[in-house]
């Protein structure tokens, strides 16, 4: 009867308060520079040590510049936050992957690629996109700063048990359709609140066909549907990805781990609180047109009209389109764009750079387009160079920047100017997310690449 979520959650319950929260043991805490300073300050004020320092990994990513990382950070706020994390990690005896450390990168890219995120774990971080790690078959979710302090002090957290939802995507994915498109399609149908209160398990033939990188992308976007987290049962794809990585089990321990991981799946008779089904054949390359990730459509489609909308929905819809400079019923194909961003914890992995390179190879970047290609980690950067993707990208007029969160959010130097259109592989298109007045169009690396070389919104299938 147990779901995958139930198995992992129940294995980590320390105690349950009647009609209250569960005390849940946490296997891994990730800390970055933005949401951790007050947590460490709280420990200092109480004279508390970190309970299990070996379970905590720290790295800056949000504020790190994507150029000249060997020089002091110019922005004083960013410098303070990055320096504070360095000091806190040193003071409390925590593992810290600082800027220019070849293990550094975006926390949700580094965790899986370093073998720090493993099936069956409970994982938290003061960051909403912690759901990414669920792709490995873990229960992973974002927490607030006061909860970060709680985990640092006790290695436990108080949480109410969420409901469970299974989203099944049956059938085979079409040409040019990626995990990013699956996620944007789901949100366009379910809205950004469609999974609120649920922990989602993704299943079905289309999900199983995804690479590990694709699964990480899909689970990353779970939070944008309102879900507490997302997860995929581990299988041979997962095991092959983990095997031999820096912190992965070795030798006999590996064999024992895989034996256990194979039990981490929902039973055939498992009951979910809600079941949702989609057909892979209905999904095409997607793009957003509004100011939340649920305002997406197939790239060949038209922006919806206001027909049938109530006044409240209509007002919100039109306000969003006004910000974007679009009209109801308008097509986006052929629309001129200004910026392209490849990166973020959503699409900053090696597979994403391979996809982007496959489209731009033999072409040239459109002259007016400014493109920021930002690896999610130094490991991804090294892979790009090992595979010769840097040569393909540079020949096409693109430069590769240094790792970091970059233009996903306006917390560093990489900001989109007001009124400019950015085709972005990141996860949020809220007003001002990429910079005050910036207009963000969320898409896959394939769609971003097509826009980068044509200078307009284009269907990547025509370039494949």
Curated annotation (Swiss-Prot):
Documented EC number(s): 4.2.1.33
Pathway assignment: Amino-acid biosynthesis; L-leucine biosynthesis; L-leucine from 3-methyl-2-oxobutanoate: step 2/4
GO molecular function terms listed in the Swiss-Prot or TrEMBL record: 3-isopropylmalate dehydratase activity; 4 iron, 4 sulfur cluster binding; metal ion binding
SUPFAM superfamilies in the cross-refs: Aconitase iron-sulfur domain (SSF53732)
Any GO BP annotation: L-leucine biosynthetic process
Binding site for [4Fe-4S] cluster: 345, 405, 408
Domain of life: Bacteria
Cofactor binding notes: Binds 1 [4Fe-4S] cluster per subunit.
Paired cysteines (S-S): none
Enzyme class: lyase
The keyword Cell division is assigned to this record: no
Cofactor(s) required for function per UniProt: [4Fe-4S] cluster
Keywords tagged on the record: 4Fe-4S, Amino-acid biosynthesis, Branched-chain amino acid biosynthesis, Iron, Iron-sulfur, Leucine biosynthesis, Lyase, Metal-binding
Reactions listed under catalytic activity: (2R,3S)-3-isopropylmalate = (2S)-2-isopropylmalate
Subunit relationships: Heterodimer of LeuC and LeuD.
Family, per entry: Belongs to the aconitase/IPM isomerase family. LeuC type 1 subfamily.
Function: Catalyzes the isomerization between 2-isopropylmalate and 3-isopropylmalate, via the formation of 2-isopropylmaleate.
Protein name: 3-isopropylmalate dehydratase large subunit
Name of the gene this protein is made from: leuC
């Amino acid at each position: 009867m147990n779901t995958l979520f139930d198995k992992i959650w129940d294995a980590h319950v320390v105690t349950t308060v009647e009609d209250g929260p569960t005390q849940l043991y946490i296997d891994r805490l990730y800390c970055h520079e933005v949401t951790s300073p007050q947590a460490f300050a709280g420990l200092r004020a109480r004279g508390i040590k970190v309970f299990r320092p070996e379970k905590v990994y720290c790295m800056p990513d949000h504020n790190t510049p994507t150029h000249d990382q060997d020089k002091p950070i110019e922005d004083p706020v960013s410098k303070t936050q990055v320096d504070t994390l360095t000091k806190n990690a040193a003071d409390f005896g925590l593992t810290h992957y600082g800027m220019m450390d070849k293990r550094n990168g975006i926390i949700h890219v580094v965790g899986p690629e370093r073998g720090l995120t493993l099936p069956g774990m409970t994982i938290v971080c003061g960051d909403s996109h912690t759901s990414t790690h669920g792709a490995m078959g873990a229960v992973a979710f974002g927490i607030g700063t006061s909860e970060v302090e709680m985990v640092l002090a006790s290695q436990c957290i108080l949480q109410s048990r969420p409901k469970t939802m299974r989203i099944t995507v049956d059938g085979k994915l079409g040409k040019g359709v990626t995990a990013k498109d699956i996620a944007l399609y789901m949100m366009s149908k379910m809205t950004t609140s469609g999974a609120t209160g649920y922990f989602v398990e993704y299943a079905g033939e289309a999900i199983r066909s995804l690479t590990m990188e694709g699964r990480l992308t899909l689970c990353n976007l779970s939070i944008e549907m309102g879900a507490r987290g997302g997860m995929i049962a581990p299988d041979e794809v997962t095991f092959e990805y983990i095997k031999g990585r820096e912190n992965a089990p070795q030798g006999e321990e590996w064999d024992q781990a895989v034996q256990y991981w194979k039990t981490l799946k929902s039973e055939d008779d498992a009951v979910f609180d809600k079941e949702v089904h989609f057909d892979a054949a209905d999904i095409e390359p997607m793009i957003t047109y509004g100011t939340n990730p649920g305002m997406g459509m197939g790239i060949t489609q038209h922006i919806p009209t206001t027909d049938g909308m109530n006044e409240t929905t209509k007002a919100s819809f039109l306000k969003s389109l006004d910000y974007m400079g679009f009209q109801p019923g308008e097509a986006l194909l052929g629309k001129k764009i200004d910026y392209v961003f490849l990166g973020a914890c959503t699409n900053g992995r090696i597979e994403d750079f391979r996809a982007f390179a496959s489209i731009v190879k033999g072409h040239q970047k459109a002259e007016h387009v400014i493109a920021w290609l930002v690896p999610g980690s130094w490991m991804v950067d090294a892979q790009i160079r090992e595979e010769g993707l840097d040569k393909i990208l540079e020949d096409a007029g693109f430069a590769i920047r240094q790792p970091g969160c970059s233009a996903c959010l306006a917390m560093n130097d990489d900001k989109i100017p007001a009124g400019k259109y950015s085709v972005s592989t990141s996860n949020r298109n809220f007003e001002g997310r990429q910079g005050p007045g910036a207009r963000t169009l969320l898409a896959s690396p394939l769609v971003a690449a097509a826009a980068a070389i044509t200078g307009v919104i284009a269907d990547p299938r025509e370039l494949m």
